[in-house]
Amino acid sequence: MKEKVVLAYSGGLDTSIIIPWLKENYDLDVIAVCVNVGQGDDMDYVKTKAIKSGASKIYVEDVKEEFVVDYLYKAIKSEALYEQDYMLGTSFARPLMAKKLVEIAHKEQAKYICHGCTGKGNDQVRFEVGVKAQDPTIKIIAPWRIWDIKSREDAIDYAKKVGVEVPVTKKKIYSVDKNLWHVSHEGGDLEDLKNEHKEDMYFMVTPPEKAKDEPTYLEIYFEKGAPVKINGEVLNPVDIIDKLNTIGGENGIGIADIIENRLVGMKSRGIYETPAGTLLYAAHKKLESVTLDKYTYQYKKIVSAQYGELVYNGLWFTSLREAIDAFVDKTQENVTGTVQLKLYKGNIKPCSVDTEYALYDEGISSFGESELYSHKDAEGFINLFGLPSKIKALKNF
């Protein structure tokens, strides 16, 4: 009986040719696993294609709701970003995929897990560290670090040789990753920084100059930091993301052209579409500015950056990530209320906040006198606050 390998399968170029390559070079029984995080593929087609390509079995795991509730809601609550720009759409999906791969490897008693990540990318780290954190006995096969195929053009040639159909041509050769949260585009002419990216690549977003000519007003209600209602309507978590992707997309919201520092050392360029995430982060940030005290708000910004770096670097299965989640959950206890946004041709303008947990007090913040604050109090405060500066000036160093 042949030993088994569980393959992270998408039906795309890389994983399509890996099936015959594994059989040819390792003589393994290939169990394909497609983790459905909302990439929008025809799963019946994916199943058929995996079997036609030589897999003995195909699992399709629909984890969209788990992805939103257990991963994306953590992103929203923490407002995690990598290098202040990247909303981590790929990064948040990978630990969930690794979790499912290990579960099926255990179920199938497979000794190997295989992925189609390149040897220059971050995903190889995310998958492999995620697998090792759950079961260090499982062996990893990473074809892009082993085989003679050196480019995506080579991969297309190999696909033709072994008779595997792939939805990519040499002329239009972007690497695309798609899920509920985002679409990323890399490779091809994007690798030359002198090239403006082409707007016809967009899947989710209308180019801002072609977006609606009238502004859209949007209300998002959060409960303890998590979105619950859109325009007053309670929706399930997946529908919330879908609806906001539609609203944001038709208003030209959510495009980012980013140069990022990869974990493996080099810089890379990616075009990201994240309409729902962009709207949710903007609304959540506004609500936090009203409901969090000064020091919690400022410290959380530091923690958010650390959280984004952890997730980007594939360190989901760590005690630090769990500890940050616990801190973030504490900060979200009063992050409940409604934020109204005005959307117009790629721009977001926060309009209003309605929350019973506001730390903003109009009576205190106005220029008039109040029982809690007297203008005369400012003089003593300024003297004490400025004392270090005054002492230094007197010393005349």
UniProtKB/Swiss-Prot annotation:
It comes from the Bacteria. It catalyses: L-citrulline + L-aspartate + ATP = 2-(N(omega)-L-arginino)succinate + AMP + diphosphate + H(+). It is found in: Cytoplasm. L-aspartate binds at residues 118, 122-123. ATP binds at residues 8-16, 116. Its main location: cytoplasm. GO terms for cellular component: cytoplasm. Its EC number is 6.3.4.5. L-citrulline binds at residues 86, 91, 122, 126, 175, 184, 260, 272. It is an enzyme of class 6 (ligase). Keywords: Amino-acid biosynthesis, Arginine biosynthesis, ATP-binding, Cytoplasm, Ligase, Nucleotide-binding. InterPro entries: Arginosuc_syn_C, Arginosuc_syn_N, Arginosuc_synth, Arginosuc_synth_CS, Arginosuc_synth_type_1_subfam, AS_cat/multimer_dom_body, Rossmann-like_a/b/a_fold. Pathway: Amino-acid biosynthesis; L-arginine biosynthesis; L-arginine from L-ornithine and carbamoyl phosphate: step 2/3. One of its GO terms (biological process) is urea cycle. One of its GO terms (molecular function) is argininosuccinate synthase activity. PANTHER family: ARGININOSUCCINATE SYNTHASE. Belongs to the argininosuccinate synthase family. Type 1 subfamily. HAMAP family: Arg_succ_synth_type1. Homotetramer. This is Argininosuccinate synthase. It comes from Clostridium botulinum (strain Hall / ATCC 3502 / NCTC 13319 / Type A). The lineage of its organism: Bacteria, Bacillati, Bacillota, Clostridia, Eubacteriales.
